[in-house]
A protein has these predicted regions:
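Carboxylate-rich, polar loop motifs that coordinate divalent cations or form catalytic acidic clusters
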Residues: 1-260
Length: 260
């Protein structure tokens, strides 16, 4: 079964490379693909983390006898910060990849030394350098001599499962909570709740475009755009329909968004 493909754009055509679980990939269920600043391509799956250097794959999996192995095989989030550090978010915690030893840091711990075993949904570096993670807990991560520590800030929002995050141009943090809508957290720790009574709708992605406009991809309500003067999200209809399921948003040109 072919599951993963690289596409190279050439002057007179296109070339493809196909990879399968028979020989290369650890799983057919891919959660995230990311290329780091060194050109390495990382593929997060539900059964291990894969790294491709252009010639071969290396598969990383959990080894219960090695605390510097992947802490869980279900990998959902990958994030490279401004210092080039690669964070790996799993079903059971967050780690840093160490290229010098080709291994991973010990799992993050809370300030009291207890293991931070949160199911990590997303990772974000804010403009002030803070690293935020979402999942079972919405918190910040600090790094001291390679050790990760999780900090629980006092936030004016429910502590339930949080999914995706972005920081807008005004330094507001937007946090989605699935069927519970989306929260906007301002720098002065005030919050506003949007779409809190939208039944039959789940937010699965959010995006800020080049103009600073915020969009939500949803299952049940299609694409929504934030109207800043009215402080509300409005539907973007396709052929008069609002319920077209949208799962992903990216910008492909100055004036075009790609929806999936």
């Amino acid at each position: 079964l072919t599951l993963f493909m690289f596409l190279s754009l050439l002057c007179h055509g296109q070339s493809y490379k196909f990879f399968t679980t028979d020989r290369e990939l650890s799983s057919s269920l891919i959660n995230k693909i990311y290329q780091d600043r060194n050109g390495m391509i990382w593929i997060a799956t539900e059964d291990g983390l894969n790294r491709y250097d252009g010639a071969k794959f290396i598969i990383y999996k959990h080894d219960p006898q090695n605390e510097h192995s992947l802490c869980h095989n279900y990998v959902r989030a990958l994030y490279e910060d401004s210092k080039g550090r690669l964070f790996v978010g799993t079903y059971n915690g967050i780690q840093l990849y160490d290229p010098a030893t080709d291994s991973f840091s010990a799992r993050a711990q809370w300030e009291d030394g207890k293991t931070f075993d949160s199911n990590i949904m997303s990772i974000l570096e804010c403009r002030n350098g803070e690293i935020w993670v979402s999942g079972n807990n919405l918190c910040t991560i600090t790094i001291t001599q390679g050790k990760l520590t999780a900090h629980k800030p006092d936030l004016p929002i429910p502590t339930q499962m949080t999914d995706y995050m972005i920081e807008d141009r005004q330094h507001n943090l937007w946090v989605t909570q699935g069927e519970n809508g989306i929260y906007r957290l301002s720098a002065d720790n005030k919050s506003k709740h949007f779409l809190k009574q939208e039944k039959g709708m789940t937010i699965v992605d959010l995006y800020e475009d080049n103009y600073g406009d915020i969009y939500l991809a949803t299952i049940g309500k299609g694409l929504l755009k934030y109207n800043q003067p009215a402080e509300e999200f409005i539907p973007i209809l396709y052929k008069g329909k609002q319920n077209l399921p949208i799962k992903s948003i990216c910008q492909i040109s100055q004036n075009e968004l790609c929806l999936g």
